[in-house]
Amino acid sequence: MPTSTLLWSVGSLALSSMVLPAAASSYELVETWKGEDFLTAFDFYTGADPTNGFVTYANQSYAESTGLVKVNSNGTFYMGVDHTTKLSTNGPGRESVRIGSNKYYDEGLFIIDLQHMPGSVCGTWPAFWSTGKNWPTDGEIDIIEGVNKNEANEIVLHTSGTCQVSSQKMSGTLTSTECGEDAGTTGCVVEGTQGSSGTPFNENGGGVYAMQWTDEFLKFWFFPRGSIPSSITKGDPDVAAFGTPMAHMEGSCSIAEHFKAQQFIFDTTFCGDWAGGVYSTSGCPVSDSSSSFKSCVAYVAENPTAFAESYWEINYIKIYQTGVAASASASASHVESAASVAETISAVREGTNSVVATTTAATIAVTSTADAETATTMAGATTVAASTETSAADENGSSASTSTHYVTMTTTICPIAESSSAAAALAGGSSEATEASNSEGSPAAATPSSVTGASAEANESESTSAAVTTPSTSTGASAEANGSESSSASEAGSVAGATPSSVSTTGASGEADSSEGASAAATPSNVSSTGASAEANGSEDSSASSEAKTVAPSIPSSVTGASAEANGNDSASSNAATASNVSGASAQAGDNESTPASAGANAGSSAAPSSVSGASAEANGSEGSSSHSSGSQAGAHSYGSVPSSAAAYGRPAPSSSSHAFATAPSSTGSSRVPTSAAAANNAAAATQGSSASGSNSGSSGHGSSSATTPSTPVFTGGANKLTLGASSVLSVLAFALLA
């Protein structure tokens, strides 16, 4: 290679390493909610109020029919309370609405444009806040909150243990520095500026709140209607131009450790632990000098018209995260000399929601870690120095199985990790579960109870099928179809849930030789794939697609180490689609022509029984063969297809919930420490739906606890960096010299 060409290649490589970080760190819009979106992207909570409020939360159909919620003619979303009915102080509380997003979101930039929020009215306690699945461990962020006649917003953080923040440059006033529960339930508090909430906010035409969440800090800005930055109105927010935040939460506390993926919640309650507790000292009418709470309830019950202004009117909410689109785009345009992309999806023991994309100038390695709880994570990219040797471990140092493959870089990288508590996790990172199809014979896919060590072989065969049926628990099941034409070996997942009760087969095997179109099928009940990868090397017009190279956002359950390989193929395609629960599944199709190889299933029902370990299938040296690792999957390729399963969105221990859109109930709750009376309310409502409990008390804090929420997506973003390692440069130099 001429010296000039070599220097050009090295120079381009070095330049790309400097350009990529800037491109990758920009915020990309990942979610917009406005108008009708609040009726589909949020669930209506109908349980007892865990803060002991004098309130009755309406379900969606009732709320829509009575006008408690509606989409206005100008496209804004209205969410109000009953302001016409006089009530008995001994009866049910005033009707209101509480909604929570059916997805969870990690770090990013969150912008809400409000036309109106509940006014400064005695007895009210409105809030826009978020909570993690496990309160207080995963944290709570109170973005907008106030009680009674408050006119200045309170921004509060809650989490577990100890979590200190210190005084930073901000326009608000830091009044409490300890966010952790060890010091009580007050949380760390910033008192906002006058007019940042309530009646003055509405009189000024509303405004915009922005929250920036990173590993190191949480910042909050409030912009009155006439002072909204142009970058926000243009849809390209520039936090560097936002100015001094109203609240800046940063200190010795590790934000990354104490605040995990959050669900966003709107509600308006009445009285309750905070508003009722301070009612008599808030300048509100007192009817019972012996009880602030009773005075609050009496006022709320007897003065419905006072609450005509107690409504939310939302223009939009936009969520931005870093790196996903920008990283892939920059990689394609600036790293022209990069010949491959390494995609590594690792199955990690439960305990992490994070997804990290590891990028180098010559090789892009995407490492995704899958939470054993139910969550789908869309990653931003946090990148480090190059290495094709990858491994993952959870916070406790638990090791994770890792599968690294290389594919030609022809696609956008959008890593997703997901897991499901509804389905048993699979072990065996080296095991393979695949289907090699294009057969003339049809594979049988019945699904009995448990099969151990089942195998099926179809060698040098024509039109013969051998089937091994394995739903509930299938260990070491394998299927091989070698040297055959149009051979098929498959591991299907949860085929419409046909699972007889207890049929146990150990060491069953079937062989069919000298047949064409041979098939061997092993069908586990509920297959969940985490970490699917695909390879297509040395091929013409080859592609590794969808959930392997661009992992589809709304894969229900968990993907662990599944891989598909298509080597030396013409027009080879490899597809890793992921369904319910498969660990270490792999498929190989070598030296084939027109060979699709895929891991994953795009349709089926998520029936969720057991687990599959070490199932494998191989189809080698065949023409027109395909290999698949199929599992059970509902609603693939759509973020919103996974039903929301957060039954109670924060403010602990609701006893029941009713989801208009969720078919699978769950238990997520949050609270400000319910009293024994609240516990009684919760018990009384226990027959209405799923429940969860938590505790929290004091002037602020909602909290969430006992969250098992199956199949609830989690979207994560992160900072994007790229370091050009010396080894990468040397590798390129060596390659160039050899060439």
Curated annotation (Swiss-Prot):
Q: Which GO terms describe its biological process?
A: cellulose catabolic process
Annotated ranges, domain GH16: 31-283
Q: Does the record carry Signal as a key word? A: yes
Q: Which Gene3D superfamilies match?
A: 2.60.120.200
**Active-site residues, as the UniProt record annotates them:** E140 (nucleophile), E145 (proton donor)
Going by the entry's taxonomy, the superkingdom of the source organism is recorded as Eukaryota
Propeptide residue numbers?
Answer: 718-739
Q: Which residues cross the membrane?
A: none
Q: Which UniProt keywords apply?
A: Carbohydrate metabolism, Cell membrane, Cellulose degradation, Glycoprotein, Glycosidase, GPI-anchor, Hydrolase, Lipoprotein, Membrane, Polysaccharide degradation, Signal
| Cleavable signal peptide | 1-24
What's the protein's topology in the membrane? Lipid-anchor; GPI-anchor
Q: Which residues are glycosylated?
A: N59, N74, N396, N459, N482, N526, N537, N569, N581, N592, N620
Comp. bias regions, Low complexity: 431-442, 452-499, 507-522, 561-587, 597-641, 674-713
Q: Which GO terms describe its cellular component?
A: plasma membrane; side of membrane
- SUPFAM superfamilies, per database record: Concanavalin A-like lectins/glucanases
| EC assignment | 3.2.1.6
Query: Where does this one sit in the cell?
Result: Cell membrane
Q: What does this protein do?
A: Mixed-linked glucanase involved in the degradation of complex natural cellulosic substrates.
**Family the entry assigns:** Belongs to the glycosyl hydrolase 16 family.
User: Protein name, please?
Assistant: Probable endo-1,3(4)-beta-glucanase An02g00850
Species annotation: Aspergillus niger (strain ATCC MYA-4892 / CBS 513.88 / FGSC A1513)
